[in-house]
Amino acid sequence: MRHPVVMGNWKLNGSKEMVVELLNGLNAELEGVTGVDVAVAPPALFVDLAERTLTEAGSAIILGAQNTDLNNSGAFTGDMSPAMLKEFGATHIIIGHSERREYHNESDEFVAKKFAFLKENGLTPVLCIGESEAQNEAGETVAVCARQIDAVINTQGVDALNGAIIAYEPIWAIGTGKAATAEDAQRIHAQIRAHIAEKSEEVAKNVVIQYGGSVKPENAAAYFAQPDIDGALVGGAALDAKSFAAIAKAAAEAKA
């Protein structure tokens, strides 16, 4: 039985004050809510403060991060390692986000190496996949997603997906206000799962596949009502405690 995961990607947003206010607000909003794992990925500089804030509150919120390097130490200016993230309690690490693929020229192969290194270090990769608007219009959505997943499967085996999370985020829906319909998202999720099932039905059945791309309280329930959508990777709405908590509650209710 897959357990829903709702994760907030704060991207390049926040301040010390915002971190404390948002996390304390989330703790209050989520009191008594069960049946969903809730995670947050603040900017790297705020991971320490987020850990302290969550620990002091005795919070069940999972701490994550937005990136990792391929090394645990060395002459790699500006990077952060899985070992460092572990020391601060971060467990769920986003990799392959379209913004990093585009702005930092991260290839499928490079993302797959990050995936392997996170697994080697006992952390949970949150593997982002998704197509551009042009690829969507050309009918290439499933082929693009399959290629991005196969970069992992072909180098590490399908069992590497056990315990990992896949986040399907159509690039044209990220931060644009446009969102795939729940039915369209379900169709793609089902095809992603079917692609994995070609290698292992057991892995496909158990892997969590989130939807991301303009998820809001108003549309969350429709997504989570779909059988192959196991949660959400949330951007803008994750910066507001009430909105993000409402999305998490919708997941808990839909998957109960």
Swiss-Prot record:
It catalyses: D-glyceraldehyde 3-phosphate = dihydroxyacetone phosphate. Its EC number is 5.3.1.1. Pathway: Carbohydrate biosynthesis; gluconeogenesis; Carbohydrate degradation; glycolysis; D-glyceraldehyde 3-phosphate from glycerone phosphate: step 1/1. The keyword Phosphoprotein does not apply. GO terms for cellular component: cytosol. It comes from the Bacteria. Homodimer. PANTHER family: TRIOSEPHOSPHATE ISOMERASE. This is Triosephosphate isomerase. It comes from Aliivibrio fischeri (strain ATCC 700601 / ES114) (Vibrio fischeri). The gene is tpiA.
